[in-house]
From Swiss-Prot:
<dbReference type="InterPro" id="IPR008991">
    <property type="entry name" value="Translation_prot_SH3-like_sf"/>
</dbReference>
<dbReference type="InterPro" id="IPR018259">
    <property type="entry name" value="Ribosomal_eL21_CS"/>
</dbReference>
<protein>
    <recommendedName>
        <fullName>Large ribosomal subunit protein eL21</fullName>
    </recommendedName>
</protein>
<dbReference type="GO" id="GO:0006412">
    <property type="term" value="P:translation"/>
</dbReference>
<dbReference type="InterPro" id="IPR022856">
    <property type="entry name" value="Ribosomal_eL21_arc"/>
</dbReference>
<keyword id="KW-0689">Ribosomal protein</keyword>
<keyword id="KW-0687">Ribonucleoprotein</keyword>
<dbReference type="InterPro" id="IPR036948">
    <property type="entry name" value="Ribosomal_eL21_sf"/>
</dbReference>
<dbReference type="Pfam" id="PF01157">
    <property type="entry name" value="Ribosomal_L21e"/>
</dbReference>
<dbReference type="GO" id="GO:0003735">
    <property type="term" value="F:structural constituent of ribosome"/>
</dbReference>
<dbReference type="GO" id="GO:0005840">
    <property type="term" value="C:ribosome"/>
</dbReference>
<comment type="similarity">
    <text>Belongs to the eukaryotic ribosomal protein eL21 family.</text>
</comment>
<dbReference type="InterPro" id="IPR001147">
    <property type="entry name" value="Ribosomal_eL21"/>
</dbReference>
<dbReference type="GO" id="GO:1990904">
    <property type="term" value="C:ribonucleoprotein complex"/>
</dbReference>
Amino acid sequence: MPKSHGFRKNTRDKLKKSVRERGISPVVRAIQDFAVGEKVHIIIDPSIHKGMPHPKFHGRTGTVVGRRGRAYVLEVPDQSAKKLVIALPEHLVAQK
């Protein structure tokens, strides 16, 4: 069989919810608000496909640079480069 080149390839464990997290995500997570300059963690919610950043960025921390519609534009360091990642608030968690 040919190798898959899809967006979610090699994510069997990365995009898996634990038993206690299964089911519908809370609405509070969708209406979070982040200020520009705030640090956020990218934690992908696999049950919500819209606005999902690339799985490569799962677990990374970035800085909010701006908004694009309902989504946030984040600046995430990737080795020596800085990448812009667009993600909906459902996939973001504020850094404490």
